[in-house]
């Protein structure tokens, strides 16, 4: 029965080096010594996996040909050593699986705590912020309304003061006009008194003339009574009574006419003055009404202008505050995005590294399982036959090595990461 000698060697590195399997073997006939390469595997962090080889010599020969025991004394010790190492391999595999589970749990926990979806939800505060902003806006509007009411009250007080001044000026003007009219009335009264005095004097003169005329008539009568009646053809004498009556009537008519003319003139002057006073008062009132309306319009426009200016200032302040608030929020969001991007890049790089390490560990596990199966077949007495063609094929396999260079560029401002950039370069060795 032929046996073959095989030696397994693995070398794993952090630069994603493919597993290299080198086999060298030679065929021994019966009665020769066969060396079995026994492997001890232990892992190093980020330094790949190294394989140590322990060689044990087993003698075959006539024991096999004579049907003796396959494993002698030394062979039993070697198999016990193999079993111990196999148990250590299995323990190593279990520990690696546990480490892998722990790493997966840590990755999952890290994603749960640091993933962007787990950012604190501030939406519950938005309603309070909106309510407070509305209250501030309402308070500003109420403040502007109070200021406007104060201005309106001041303008109304000023309007009443101006109206009071206007009414007082009108009162003074009317009193002055009344004083002027009273002077005119006094003058007319004096003229009336003068005319009445003149009428009385004229009446006295008339009475005196009547008395004198009566006396002259009496004198003439006495003279005629003492004289002899002589009839003489002569012109008729003058009738003095008729003449006096005519004169009296003329003077009475003249006095009545003068009195009537004085009364009419007084009434005309009074009416003219009253009309002028009325017209002037109406014009003055119309002018005052126009002035009052213009002042009121001016005050209304001034109030509206002040309210618009105050509203404009309030809106400008609100706009500036809103811009500043949104600018700060935008800066905070950008900073958060930059930090999250940097964390995401770091997570990706860590995930790739852990995935690579996981693949390495999985490959080690697979190869260990293959070796365990090989040892199991050896323990069960199976032969491992490797032909010259298989050996040449394994030796002829190309070993591909790649080098991966990862560059992380971070921009830090005031101790905070603003931007982060990761570059990866893969080279064939």
Swiss-Prot record:
Gene3D superfamilies: 1.20.5.170, Single helix bin, Vasodilator-stimulated phosphoprotein. Pfam families: Filament. The keyword Phosphoprotein applies. GO terms for biological process: apoptotic process; cellular response to starvation; epithelial cell differentiation; intermediate filament organization; regulation of protein secretion. Residues 1-26 are annotated as: Disordered. Residues 1-74 are annotated as: Head. This is Keratin, type I cytoskeletal 20. It comes from Rattus norvegicus (Rat). The lineage of its organism: Eukaryota, Metazoa, Chordata, Craniata, Vertebrata. The gene is Krt20.
């Amino acid at each position: 029965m032929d046996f073959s000698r095989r030696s397994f060697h693995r070398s794993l590195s952090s630069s994603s080096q493919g597993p290299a399997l080198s086999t060298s073997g030679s065929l021994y006939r019966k009665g020769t010594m066969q060396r079995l390469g026994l492997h001890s595997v232990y892992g190093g962090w980020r330094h790949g996996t190294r394989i140590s080889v322990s060689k044990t010599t087993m003698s075959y020969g006539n024991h096999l040909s004579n049907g003796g025991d396959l494993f002698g004394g030394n062979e039993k010790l070697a198999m016990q050593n193999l079993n111990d190492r196999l148990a250590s391999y299995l323990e190593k595999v279990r520990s690696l699986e546990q480490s892998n589970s722990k790493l997966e749990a840590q990755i999952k926990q890290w994603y749960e705590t640091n993933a962007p979806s787990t950012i604190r939800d501030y939406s519950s505060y938005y309603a309070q912020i909106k309510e407070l902003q509305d209250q501030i806006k309402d308070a500003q509007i109420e403040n502007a309304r109070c200021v406007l009411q104060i201005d309106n009250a001041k303008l109304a007080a000023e309007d009443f003061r101006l109206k009071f001044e206007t009414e007082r000026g009108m009162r003074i003007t009317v009193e002055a006009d009344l004083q002027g009219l009273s002077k005119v009335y006094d003058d007319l009264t004096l003229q009336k008194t003068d005319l009445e005095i003149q009428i009385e004097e004229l009446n006295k003169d008339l009475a005196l003339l009547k008395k004198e005329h009566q006396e002259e008539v009496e004198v003439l009568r006495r003279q005629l009574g003492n004289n002899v009646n002589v009839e003489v053809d002569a012109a008729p004498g003058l009738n003095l009574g008729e003449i006096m009556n005519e004169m009296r009537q003329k003077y009475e008519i003249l006095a009545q006419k003068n009195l009537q003319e004085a009364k009419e003139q007084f009434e005309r002057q009074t009416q003219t003055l009253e009309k002028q006073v009325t017209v002037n008062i109406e014009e003055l009132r119309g002018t005052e009404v126009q002035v009052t309306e213009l002042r009121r319009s001016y005050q209304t426009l001034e109030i509206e202008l002040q309210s618009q200016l105050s509203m404009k200032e309030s809106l400008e302040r609100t706009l500036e505050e809103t811009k500043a608030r949104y600018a700060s929020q935008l800066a905070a969001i950008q900073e958060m995005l930059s930090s999250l991007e940097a964390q995401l890049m770091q997570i990706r790089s860590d995930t790739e590294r852990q995935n690579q390490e996981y693949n390495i560990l999985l490959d080690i596990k697979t190869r260990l399982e293959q070796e365990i199966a090989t040892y199991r077949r050896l323990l069960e007495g199976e032969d491992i036959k490797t032909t010259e063609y298989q050996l040449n094929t394994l030796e002829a396999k190309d070993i591909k090595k790649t080098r991966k260079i990862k560059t992380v560029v971070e921009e830090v401002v005031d101790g905070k990461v603003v931007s982060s950039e990761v570059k990866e370069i893969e080279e064939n060795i």
